[in-house]
Amino acid sequence: MYLYAWYVYVYYMDTIPAWALKYKTRGVYIRNVGNNYYAYRTRSRWVKEEKRTKTLPPEYLGVVTRNGIVRKDQVMGIRSDYEYGNIALLYGIAERTILPVLKEVYPYLYGRIINYVILRNIQPLPMKSIRYLYEKTYLSRISDESMSPASISGMLSSLPEDRSISVMRKLTEKGEYVLMDSTAIFSRSENISFLEPGHNPKEMHLPQINVMMLFSATRTMPTFIRILPGSIRDVSAMANTIDMAGVEKCVIVADKGFFSAENVNKLRKKHLSYIIPLRRNSSLIPEPDHFMGVFMYDGKPVKYWKRENDVYIYEDPVLKSEEEKDYLIRIEENKRSRKQFDENEINFGKLYLLSDLNEEPERVYRLYKQREYVEYAFNVYKNDLEADRSYLRDDHMLFTYMFLNLLSLYLHFQILNIIDGKYSVRDVLLILSRIKMYRMEKSEIMSEIPKKSRELVEKLEIDLDMLCKK
């Protein structure tokens, strides 16, 4: 009997979390049903005729939340509810990273800035719709900022460019490896003078701006953004951007179209390090001997050769097999010849990188592969700019818009770096949005926490009580 009671006690303590157990008082017990916890009071009465106490059905008290027991009559008195869990995660990260910097540089506008940056992470809506998202999140309960289109537009025009540059410089840590890449963003806005015809890899003849981004390879984090007229895309602009950011160790990570002897000489004259992929028919590629070693990348083996004439050679066996298979299919379809196969077989699965870095081959490979994260970040800008073009009345507003989106990306990558790939950042924020805060007539009560949301709260170590103290 005692052993059974002990097992019941241990099971009870293991299945009910500590925050719910604190509401277990004399005569009150907590029951776990699904993903929720409910409080009941034991009841009994003395039966005089039988001279014994008779147990009665328990009295239901209400749902157990982190803020207390919500009675049935209180639930009926809910005035409104707000998305809470996603705000708790983003605001908590912001408090540890960008918020102290914003308070220092923009002491009167940091509240509106951080609201905009957080809301862009939850859902990248056009500026005209941000207010409606703001009003359904808990941000509107802890902030008295107006997030109307007019207030956001006013913020874009009033943030001094030199102060925004100061914020970005503070986000770049001394001594870390920083990658630089650039891209063209197209728009038909008639208000922005930076929009000019220019060269781009897609050979699209549309007005464009050039965007240069610095990306911390050490922390996998975007840290600096600069916009330039569409016709400017040269090495001098890269050097000036690095000087503006105050970066010590920067590597230009280019695409295949960037390579030319002239561009490489310009980089060397400016003392800029570089990693440039070479086309497979480049005359700079040395004859490969026996491979030097193997390292693992993204769960796959990668072969590498000894660096020769500043050229690093790599081979992905999985990609090699896929390329060979594709080529053989083309031969069978009479789209390629066996002679072409023999000429190209040596290049299957190969990657050739030209770099002045004197680093281990694996290090150079990983630096180059981080370009994928930079491209990921650029896509956010390309997808969002057109929706807001009517609000961007001049070059200064465009710069501020890009700056604020960089801060939004900074928070995005903070989350990306701590999740294990099971969920995307958007998935994480959506799952956490199911944690609500209910506003009652005289108080606030947090909702029950669904299982997936609870798992993320524990994994990401989210402090759900933090915003309640604001």
Q: Can you describe what each PLM-predicted range is?
A:
Residues 204-245:
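Electropositive, glycine- and tryptophan-enriched low-complexity nucleic-acid-binding patches
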Residues 207, 224-227, 270-369, 433-470:
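An anionic, glycine-rich sequence signature occurring as long contiguous blocks
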Residues 253-262, 280-283, 397:
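Acidic, metal-coordinating catalytic cores used for nucleic-acid/nucleotide bond scission
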Residues 409, 413-439:
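Conserved nucleotidyltransferase catalytic core and NTase-mimicking acidic/glycine-rich helix/loop elements
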